[in-house]
Amino acid sequence: MQQQTTLPAASLGLAASLALVAVLGPAGIDMYLASMPAMARELHTSYANVQLSLTVFLLALGGGQLLCGPLTDMLGRRRPLLAGIAVYIAAAVWASQAEQLHTLLLARTVQGLGAALTLVVVMSMVRDVADGVKAAQLFALLMTIVGLAPVLAPAVGGLLDSYYGWRAVMLALAALGALTLLNSALFLPETLPPARRIAPQGMHRTYARIAFDRAFLLPALALSAAFFFLFAYIGGASLVYQRDFGLSAGSFGLVFGATGVAVLLGAMASGRLVSRHGVARLSVAGSLAMLGGAALALLGAWAGAGIAAVVPGMFMALFGLGMAEAALMAMAMGSQQRALGSTAALLGAIQMSLSSLATPLAAGLSERGPLPWLLFLTVAGLLVSWLTLATARIHPAHATSLGAH
C-alpha cells in the first residue's frame, strides 16, 4: 500500500495533543534539575541522594510500562491515559510537600508510574494510526515538539526556584499535568477499537516473543544507549555547570536549555530527511554525531577551554541524539504488527531501566570534576554508535522500503 510522505492536518493535531502528554515525562526530569543542590541543603542530605529522586522516577517509568502495556492493549488507550495523568498530578503535589528524602522518593516513584502509563499510550497511539514513513514522520514531529521540554523546562524550573524555591517547581509539574488532562479529555480520541483489543493472557510469552526478535531488540538497545547518554548528561550537568563553571541556578537553566535546542533541531531534521534517506542512515549519522560531539567536549575541557568547549560539543551530540531517536524508535516499533501496547511497554522498560543506571554513575563521576564525566559520555557515545551500526546492518531492506514509500 502506498503511503503519504506528508502529514495531514489531522495528524498534526493528533501529534500536538500526544506531544503535550509526552512532555510530562521529560518535564518531570528536566524541570527540577537546577533545584537539586538547594533540595539537598533543605532536606539535609547529599546531592547524590537527591539524584536518587531522578533514579527512582526513571525506574518506575521503565518498569511501570511492563504492567501498563498489556493493560492498554486490553482496555484501549484513552481510559488508561487519563488515569495515568491523574496519578502524575497527585504525585507532583505530594512531592511538593515532602519534608524528608524518603517522602520525596516515594512521591517521585508514584509520579514515574503515572508517567509510564502515559508514555505507553503515546507510543501505541502513533502506531495505531500510522506505520512506515508516516510513523517515522509522526515520531519525529512528536520528538520535535517534546524537544521543547529540555529547552524550556530547565529555564522555567531555574526561574521558579530562584524566586519561589523547589516546591514551586513540583507544583508547576502538577499544573502542567492538569492542563494535559483537560486537553486529553477534550481532544484525544480512542485509537484502539474493541475489535483490535487483545486479552492479557500469556503476557510473559508476548514479551518473550518481542524481546527475542532481533528486528526489535537491536534498535531498542541502541535507543536505550542513546537515552543512557542523555541521562548521563542530565545527571552530571547541574553540578558541573554550577560548581565547576560557576553558573547560577537561573543561568544553568538557560545554558542547559540552549543545549536542549539541539535535540529539537535534530528531530526536525530527521522528520524532513527520513523519506529521502531512510531510518537506518539517519540513525547512523545521528549516533556518529553523538560520539563526535562528546569527544569534542572532552578534548576541549582537557585542553582547558572549559564551558566554551563543552557547550558546543554537547550541542552537536544532542543534535545527533534528536536525529537518531525518532529513526530508532520507528525501527523498533515497526518491527511488530500486533500487541503494540506491549511492544511500546517493552521498549520503554528497556530504555528507562538502562537509562536509570546513568544518573547515579554520572552524579558520582561529576563530583570528581568535568573530565571523568565527559569521558563517561564519550564511552556512552561509542556504545550508541556500535549498537546503531549493528541495527542498520539488519535493517537495510526494511529501511530502503520505508524510504521508498
Where are these regions (language model features)?
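Juxtamembrane intracellular "pre-TM" segments in multi-pass secondary transporters
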Residues: Q2-L7, P189-A220
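Helix-to-loop junctions at the C-terminal end of transmembrane segments
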Residues: Q65-G76, G266-V279
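Paired small-residue
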Residues: V87-W94, H102-V110, A308-M316
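Helix-loop-helix hairpin linking two adjacent transmembrane segments in secondary transporters
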Residues: T103, G132-V133, A140-L186
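Cytoplasmic helix-loop-helix junction between adjacent transmembrane helices
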Residues: A107-L148
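A late C-terminal transmembrane helix in Major Facilitator Superfamily
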Residues: M331-E367, L377
